[in-house]
């Protein structure tokens, strides 16, 4: 952050906070290169740090200085030779550098806000891992929930327009449009498996997508938090965010009543809960389904009117948690009543009291998992184990390691299940499939193979979790048993689920 501030001091007095000149500075690409070397282990390095050099960057900047190369005809865009034969490499370098430039206003705003307040507000900096306490503590007290897939803008111009509230430099925005127009099909629908999460330009597109989500949530959460004060509102106030923030400086009700005669009553729901994770959002409420339907249609109209994103209301399902399961990160979550009987005695009279409490159930999806195992030939569609014929040519240790690794990964991911019986059934299928694969390799029967090698061969399938908990609780066997049977969330399952969804 100090590097950004030092570099920007030279331009602030002359360029009026314009970011466009930074695209021609070599140190910007050096910063992008250094960040590429320090990126997370979960993000694959696509070779940008190996191919980049100072000579390539100088050549790229000299080409950008030649303004004739920036002129692109809409009807003849394929004939533009701005990058020549190094189109992919140059586009990757520019996207990395431009991502660093666009991040500067956001970083400076964060630093200035921290200096002014001198305290960090926890509710603005919540980790993605706070979703687990939300499910454990708040979810059992709610009645209805909707799992909403946040729609992607159908046009890249919408992503560019969301930056205009923070990036006040029109030249930078025009350059971004030029870049996207040159390298990507402008009218292509953006999907997570295509251009927006492309490995070569992941940083830039994640920045654009996050700015889009921030724009959407800033208005949604403001209305959600201020629902007790907003008695009258209109969708017209949401069409332009700049005008929206100018008007909230004045009394809200007076502005809405004077400027927007055609109004509608805003629904008040103090129990509404909003959670976002991995491109999805969860909207849950303790109130009636009528208010959930109002939120549902509000979101649909909000996306259509403000972001021009077509979204069908039928894709948002409102689930009653006491009757239907809720899909979350591959778990089937539901709320069931847990009734306990308490005997009370008052003087000579005694009576029984039913104490009903709601309990969160996170179930292992046994039927979809059996279908997945059947697809990769570990069992048939009925769940009967079969041999993995394609692995029969491997060594015994390699076969066992593969099966043990699959079983360990499933145990790790679904350790948050409240009932482990279905998980044990899947591990049983994997164990017998492993035995049948080894027996097929050695041209023997399963019974004969087990008698020859003994039961210790497959102990690894069931000892991994016990070894972990024995290290955590070496002396208290009762605590070990209680925790082993209970629900435990591993925080890395969010990253695992994210990688599975985008492969």
Swiss-Prot record:
It comes from the Eukaryota. It is found in: Plastid, Chloroplast. GO terms for cellular component: chloroplast. InterPro entries: Domain_X (IPR024937), Maturase_MatK (IPR002866), Maturase_MatK_N (IPR024942). GO terms for biological process: mRNA processing; RNA splicing; tRNA processing. Belongs to the intron maturase 2 family. MatK subfamily. This is Maturase K.
């Amino acid at each position: 952050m100090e590097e950004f501030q030092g570099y920007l001091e030279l331009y602030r007095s002359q360029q009026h906070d314009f970011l466009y000149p930074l695209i021609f500075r070599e140190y910007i690409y050096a910063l992008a290169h250094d960040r590429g070397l320090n990126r997370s282990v979960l993000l694959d390095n696509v070779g940008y740090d190996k191919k980049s050099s100072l000579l390539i960057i100088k050549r790229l900047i000299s080409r950008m200085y030649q303004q004739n190369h920036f002129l692109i005809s809409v009807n003849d865009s394929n004939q533009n030779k701005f990058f020549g034969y190094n189109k992919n490499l140059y586009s990757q370098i520019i996207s990395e550098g431009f991502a660093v430039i666009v991040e500067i206003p956001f970083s400076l705003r964060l630093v200035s806000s921290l200096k002014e307040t001198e305290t960090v507000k926890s509710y603005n900096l919540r980790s993605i891992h706070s979703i687990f306490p939300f499910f454990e503590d708040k979810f059992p007290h709610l009645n209805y929930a909707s799992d909403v897939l946040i729609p992607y803008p159908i046009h890249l111009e919408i992503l560019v327009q969301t930056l205009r509230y923070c990036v006040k430099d029109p030249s930078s925005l025009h350059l971004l449009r030029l870049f996207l127009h040159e390298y990507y099909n402008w009218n292509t629908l953006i999907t997570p498996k295509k251009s927006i999460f492309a490995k070569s330009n992941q940083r830039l597109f994640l920045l654009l997508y996050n700015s889009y989500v921030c724009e959407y949530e800033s208005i949604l959460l403001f209305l959600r938090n201020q629902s007790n004060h907003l008695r009258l509102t209109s969708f017209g106030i949401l069409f332009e965010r700049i005008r929206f923030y100018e008007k909230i400086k004045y009394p809200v009700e007076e502005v809405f009543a004077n400027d927007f005669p055609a109004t509608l009553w805003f629904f008040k729901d103090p129990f509404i809960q909003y959670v976002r994770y991995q491109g999805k959002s969860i909207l849950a409420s303790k109130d009636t389904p009528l208010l959930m339907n109002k939120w549902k249609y509000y979101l649909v109209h909000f996306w259509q009117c403000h972001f021009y994103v077509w979204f069908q209301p039928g894709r948002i399902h409102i689930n009653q948690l006491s009757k239907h399961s809720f899909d979350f990160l591959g778990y089937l979550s539901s709320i069931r009543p847990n009734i306990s009987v308490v005997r009370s005695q008052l003087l000579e009279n005694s009576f029984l009291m039913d104490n009903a409490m709601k309990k969160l159930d996170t179930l292992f999806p046994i039927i979809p998992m059996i279908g997945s195992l059947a697809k990769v030939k570990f069992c048939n569609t009925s769940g009967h184990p079969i041999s993995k014929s394609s692995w029969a040519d491997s060594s015994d240790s390699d076969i066992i390691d593969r099966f043990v690794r699959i079983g360990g990964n499933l145990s790790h991911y679904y350790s948050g299940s409240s009932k482990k019986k279905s998980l044990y059934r899947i591990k049983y299928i994997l164990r017998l499939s492993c035995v049948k694969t080894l027996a097929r390799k050695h041209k023997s029967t399963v019974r004969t193979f087990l008698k020859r090698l003994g039961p210790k061969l497959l102990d690894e399938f069931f000892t991994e979790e016990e070894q972990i908990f024995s290290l955590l609780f070496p002396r208290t066997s009762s605590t070990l048993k209680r925790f082993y049977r209970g629900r435990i969330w591993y925080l890395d399952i969010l990253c695992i689920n994210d990688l599975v969804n985008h492969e």
